[in-house]
Structure formats: C-alpha cells, structure tokens
Swiss-Prot record:
Binding sites annotated in the UniProt record for Mg(2+) 1: D190, E194
Span of domain KARI N-terminal Rossmann: 1-181
Protein name, entry field: Ketol-acid reductoisomerase (NADP(+))
Gene coding for it: ilvC
Note accompanying the cofactor annotation: Binds 2 magnesium ions per subunit.
PROSITE patterns: KARI_C (PS51851), KARI_N (PS51850)
Lineage top rank: taxon: Archaea
UniProt xrefs under InterPro entries: 6-PGluconate_DH-like_C_sf, KARI, KARI_C, KARI_N, KARI_prok, NAD(P)-bd_dom_sf
HAMAP family: IlvC
Keyword annotations from UniProtKB, A to Z: Amino-acid biosynthesis, Branched-chain amino acid biosynthesis, Magnesium, Metal-binding, NADP, Oxidoreductase
Binding site for substrate: S251
Free-text function comment from the UniProt entry: Involved in the biosynthesis of branched-chain amino acids (BCAA). Catalyzes an alkyl-migration followed by a ketol-acid reduction of (S)-2-acetolactate (S2AL) to yield (R)-2,3-dihydroxy-isovalerate. In the isomerase reaction, S2AL is rearranged via a Mg-dependent methyl migration to produce 3-hydroxy-3-methyl-2-ketobutyrate (HMKB). In the reductase reaction, this 2-ketoacid undergoes a metal-dependent reduction by NADPH to yield (R)-2,3-dihydroxy-isovalerate.
C-alpha cells in the first residue's frame, strides 16, 4: 500500500481552475476554507438566504446560488447529504456541466449505486477526509492535517488523478497521508463500518451490556459507567497505538477476562450476520431501502430515532454527564 504525502504532489493543474463546493455543512466548511487558505479559487454554492449562506460570507468566502456556482466552476465538489445529492444534481447542477469539467465527492454512494449519472466526457473524482469537517479544519490550522482517500471513477481529461491529489493536498490530507482507493471500495467499506461496527454494532453492544446489568439489579448509573462512559478510554488507547497498546495498558484482570470471554459475545453467528449486512450493501438492497425511506419522509428512520431517545441509557447518561460537568444543562 502506497501512502501519498505533500512531496508526492508535483503538479499544478488547479492554478487557473474554479472549484465550486456545493454545501456548507461540516465537510463543506472545513474543505472550502482549507482550499481557500491554500490559495485555490473557491466559491460556495448554496440556497440563497439560508443560515449557511451568511456563515460562508462571514468566513470570507465567495457565495453564489448552486446554479451560478455550477455554471462558473471547472470542478464541482458536492458535499451535501447523500440523500439529496441526486435531486440537487439533476435540478440545479447537471445542466451546467460541460465537457472537461470535474464532478467530485467525498463519499462514493450516489455514483457507485448509479443514482447520479455523469456524462462520459466529465471527470469523476473523490477526496475523502477520514475525519469530521471540524477536525479537518482544526488540524489544518494547527499546521498538520487528517488522513484521507482519493479515487478516480472517470478520467475524461487524462489529468483527473492530478486534480484529485492536488485538491487533497489543498485540504491538508497529504500532510497526514492519502491512500488511493476506488468508488466501490470506499462506498462499501464505509457503509459496512457504519452499520456493523461504528454506529450499529457498537451502540447495540453498549446498550445490550447496559440492559444486562440493569436487569440483574445493578444501579443504572453504575451500568452506564461500566458499559458506555469508559468506552472512550478504551477506544482512545486503540486509536493511538493499536490493540496491543490497549491490552498493555489495561489490568491483567481486564485483559484475561476480555480475551477469554469476547468470543461468547461476538460469535460466529454475529460474523455471519455481518456478512449478510455486507451482501445487502454490495447488491444495493440497503441503498434501495434508504432511498424508499428518504422518498417517503423517513418513517422508518424517524421511528428508530424516537425509540433511541426513549431508552433508559439515554436519560441516565444525560443526567450523569450533567452531574459530572461533562455536559451543560439545557
């Protein structure tokens, strides 16, 4: 695996290009400001008059409607939520895309699942920071950066790679290291990580552990500390130096118990279910399910969101964080 750094970027193809960043959420703001501060010609495309419009102007950026920004740009970097990208692209962007332009994303979802179809005479690239937009901005301002990915789905002009790696450098990604991937690999692994581990598996594991202790008669506050609050301590150890570092830093009791009991929690059946989740991502089942929910005003998502908010662990956690000074009382 080759990791690309600042010294590996030796081209200057963006010098006379205009980059329109569509959206000014977490990634939109972080990437726009970093590219602007790196000397690139950046404009932001937004809905006129919204909160983001004013914020981008206050940040010193040139702001235009999505249509006007797309019309003016050589590179259109789409950073609005996945579920609205297709509609915005079809209604406000695609009529202004010209041969030789570049359409760029930070997640491959809509290209990989063919929800957005770009003409063959247009580049399709990706620059994907592996951090939230606020962290992308913070580390850039500190003189460093965050790791990231680049991918080329369509190279119509012969210099799509140079465009992507230069954008990655301007965002600050090559300061930390960039890996080249594909739209398929980025999309499928990203969705799997979210569903089976980071957002789905981990939260399910924490909640099941909490409920097990409470149902056995232990105080909910103790259950929260032991199954949720301390999770950050363990994750930080793994993040910094890997699993070996974590095992080294915990007690022998914790290490022995963890290594001899974990296979009874995450079983072969768990792994088979992970494989099923991956297949549903690969064959488009998940993308279809999400699109149907989005197109009908999110009945499934809103129900799940409400149920999550009603869980005991949420109420206990909030009260503890406020009591310990970790969260301000609303």
């Amino acid at each position: 695996m080759k990791v690309l750094y600042d010294d590996d970027v030796n081209t200057n193809v963006l010098e006379n290009k205009t980059i329109a960043v569509i959206g000014y959420g977490s990634q939109g703001r972080g990437q726009s400001l970093n590219m602007h501060d790196s000397g690139l010609n950046v404009i932001v495309g937004l809905r006129e008059g919204g909160k983001s419009w004013k914020k981008a102007q206050e940040d010193g950026l040139t702001v235009k409607t999505i249509e006007d920004a797309s019309k003016e740009a050589d590179i259109i970097h789409i950073l609005i939520p996945d579920e609205i990208q297709k509609t915005v692209y079809e209604n406000q962007i695609q009529q202004y895309v010209e041969p030789g332009n570049t359409i760029s994303f930070s997640h491959g979802y809509n290209i990989h699942f063919n929800r957005i179809r770009v003409p063959e005479d247009v580049n399709v690239t990706m620059i994907a920071p592996k951090a939230p937009g606020s962290k992308v901005r913070q580390t850039y301002q500190e003189g460093f950066g965050t790791p990231g990915l680049i991918a080329i789905e369509q190279d119509a002009t012969g210099d799509a790679y140079d465009i992507a790696i230069e954008m990655a450098k301007a965002v600050g990604l090559t300061r930390a290291g960039v890996i080249e991937t594909t739209y398929r690999e980025e999309t499928e692994t990203d969705l799997f990580g979210e569903q089976a581990v980071l957002c789905g598996g981990l939260t399910g594991l924490i909640q099941a552990g909490f409920e097990t202790l409470v149902e056995a008669g232990y105080k909910p506050e103790m259950a929260y500390f032991e199954t949720c609050h301390e999770m950050k301590l363990i994750v930080d150890l793994i993040y910094e130096k890997g699993f070996g570092n974590m095992w080294h830093d915990v007690s022998n009791t914790a290490e022995f118990g963890g290594l001899t009991r974990r296979d009874r929690v995450i079983t072969e059946e768990s792994k088979e279910n992970m494989k099923k989740i991956l297949r549903e991502i690969q064959d488009g089942t998940f993308a279809t399910e999400f699109a149907v929910d989005a197109d009908t005003s999110y009945p499934k998502l809103l129900t799940q969101r409400r149920l999550e908010g009603e869980k005991q662990i949420e109420k206990v956690g909030k009260n503890l964080r406020i009591a310990c000074g970790l969260q301000k009382e609303e």
